[in-house]
Curated annotation (Swiss-Prot):
<keyword id="KW-0808">Transferase</keyword>
<dbReference type="InterPro" id="IPR015507">
    <property type="entry name" value="rRNA-MeTfrase_E"/>
</dbReference>
<dbReference type="InterPro" id="IPR002877">
    <property type="entry name" value="RNA_MeTrfase_FtsJ_dom"/>
</dbReference>
<dbReference type="GO" id="GO:0005737">
    <property type="term" value="C:cytoplasm"/>
</dbReference>
<keyword id="KW-0489">Methyltransferase</keyword>
<protein>
    <recommendedName>
        <fullName>Ribosomal RNA large subunit methyltransferase E</fullName>
        <ecNumber>2.1.1.166</ecNumber>
    </recommendedName>
</protein>
<comment type="function">
    <text>Specifically methylates the uridine in position 2552 of 23S rRNA at the 2'-O position of the ribose in the fully assembled 50S ribosomal subunit.</text>
</comment>
<dbReference type="GO" id="GO:0008650">
    <property type="term" value="F:rRNA (uridine-2'-O-)-methyltransferase activity"/>
</dbReference>
<dbReference type="InterPro" id="IPR029063">
    <property type="entry name" value="SAM-dependent_MTases_sf"/>
</dbReference>
<keyword id="KW-0698">rRNA processing</keyword>
<dbReference type="InterPro" id="IPR050082">
    <property type="entry name" value="RNA_methyltr_RlmE"/>
</dbReference>
<keyword id="KW-0949">S-adenosyl-L-methionine</keyword>
<comment type="similarity">
    <text>Belongs to the class I-like SAM-binding methyltransferase superfamily. RNA methyltransferase RlmE family.</text>
</comment>
<feature type="binding site">
    <location>
        <position position="84"/>
    </location>
    <ligand>
        <name>S-adenosyl-L-methionine</name>
    </ligand>
</feature>
<keyword id="KW-0963">Cytoplasm</keyword>
<dbReference type="Pfam" id="PF01728">
    <property type="entry name" value="FtsJ"/>
</dbReference>
<feature type="binding site">
    <location>
        <position position="140"/>
    </location>
    <ligand>
        <name>S-adenosyl-L-methionine</name>
    </ligand>
</feature>
Length: 226
């Protein structure tokens, strides 16, 4: 963890902290580190023991849509580093399973699978860990970007589509689907399919999402069945 320079931003006030440029660090990496240090949600996440600022995003989404409850079964796609799972457990969910390519430190009582969700057999293994149909499928999956706008867009759309197809295949009636998206990052075809299977489909941008980011969340509620 990178610590801000002593006295550089005491009490969250004053001038933003600046880091000395480390050898081998690119300008974009430097900017990202400085943004993390000065971001109030990142600082709050560290103070409260959450693994990422994304915990506040799912908190706001749940405050509005009320997904998490003691009896709910929840699947988290792209669950690293575990912030969404932390909030789900904190709000009473006891049956949940997460999957990610990256290793995730335990978040009891969640079952964790270190695997590519798009790999053969991954969805089946995840459902087996959960022990039944989920009430909520949530996806924070994001592709590795290559810097080519059209290619990155197609990768984003592809992951949203995969997550949506999975949700439609496995959800209980009345269930819900939440996925990270980007403005203009999903096709009319995906939205149309979700509208055929859910009572309501909408976009939601939490305050914890950076305002200069195109990040939004696709929220589909009232699953009508396959």
């Amino acid at each position: 963890m990178v610590k801000p320079p002593a006295g550089g931003n005491e009490g969250g006030r004053g001038k933003p902290a600046r880091l000395k440029t480390a050898y081998g660090r690119t300008p974009s990496q430097q900017a990202w580190l400085e943004r993390q240090i000065n971001d109030p949600f990142s600082a709050k996440a560290r103070a409260l023991g959450y693994r990422s600022r994304a915990a506040f995003k799912i908190s706001e989404i749940d405050d509005k849509f009320h997904f998490f409850s003691k009896g709910a079964k929840v699947i988290d796609l792209g669950c690293a580093p575990g912030g969404w799972l932390q909030i789900a457990v904190e709000r009473g969910v006891t049956t949940l399973a997460g999957i990610d390519l990256l290793p995730v430190d335990p978040v009891a009582p969640a079952h964790l699978l270190e695997m590519d969700f798009t790999a053969d057999g991954a969805p089946e293994k995840l459902l087996e860990l959960l022990g039944g149909e989920p009430d909520l499928v949530m996806s924070d999956m994001a592709p590795n970007t290559v810097g080519h706008r059209e290619t990155d867009h197609l990768r984003i759309v592809g992951l949203i589509e995969i997550a949506a197809e999975f949700a439609i295949d496995v959800l209980k009636p009345g269930g819900a689907f939440v996925a990270k998206a980007f403005q203009g990052g999903e096709t009319a075809e995906i939205i149309g399919k979700l509208k055929r299977h859910f009572d309501k489909v909408q976009h939601f941008k939490p305050k914890a999402s950076r305002q200069d980011s195109s990040e939004v969340f696709l929220v589909a509620t009232g699953f009508k069945g396959r």
